[in-house]
């Protein structure tokens, strides 16, 4: 294999290792819960990486982040395992 091919292979392996979460859960599960910046009261759930459990919180209806789920089952399937 040529040195260019080896460099390409090494680059692809590095990229794959960087983008593949170690635990198998999406990286957004590690985000802190964010209620957002509007004024609605939407019952939601977020994953707590320190306790490895899902908890309820109130979402404001806009903004926030991807660590937000409509049901505790969806949170558990996505982030707990």
UniProtKB/Swiss-Prot annotation:
It comes from the Eukaryota. Residues 29-79 form the BPTI/Kunitz inhibitor domain. One of its GO terms (cellular component) is extracellular region. Keywords: Disulfide bond, G-protein coupled receptor impairing toxin, Glycoprotein, Protease inhibitor, Secreted, Serine protease inhibitor, Signal, Toxin. Coiled coil: none annotated. Residues 1-24 form the signal peptide. Disulfide bonds join 29-79, 38-62, 54-75. PROSITE patterns: BPTI_KUNITZ_1, BPTI_KUNITZ_2. It is found in: Secreted. Glycans are attached at residue 76. One of its GO terms (molecular function) is toxin activity. InterPro entries: Kunitz_BPTI, Kunitz_BPTI_sf, Prtase_inh_Kunz-CS, TFPI/VKTCI-like. Its main location: secreted. The record marks 39-40 as: Reactive bond for chymotrypsin. Expressed by the venom gland. Serine protease inhibitor that inhibits chymotrypsin (Ki=25 nM). Also interacts with vasopressin V2 receptor (V2R/AVPR2). Inhibits vasopressin binding human V2R in the nanomolar range (Ki=112 nM), and also moderately inhibits vasopressin-induced cAMP production (IC(50)=138 nM). In vivo, intraperitoneal injection of this protein into rats increases diuresis by 2.2-fold, without any loss of electrolytes. Belongs to the venom Kunitz-type family. This is Kunitz-type serine protease inhibitor NACI. The lineage of its organism: Eukaryota, Metazoa, Chordata, Craniata, Vertebrata.
């Amino acid at each position: 294999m040529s040195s260019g091919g080896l460099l390409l292979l090494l680059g692809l392996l590095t990229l794959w290792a960087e983008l593949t979460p170690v635990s198998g859960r999406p990286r957004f599960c590690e985000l802190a819960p964010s209620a957002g910046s509007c004024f609605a009261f939407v019952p939601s759930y977020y994953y707590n990486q320190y306790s490895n459990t899902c908890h309820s919180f109130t979402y404001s209806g806009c903004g926030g982040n991807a660590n937000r789920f409509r049901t505790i089952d969806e949170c558990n399937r996505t982030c707990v395992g």
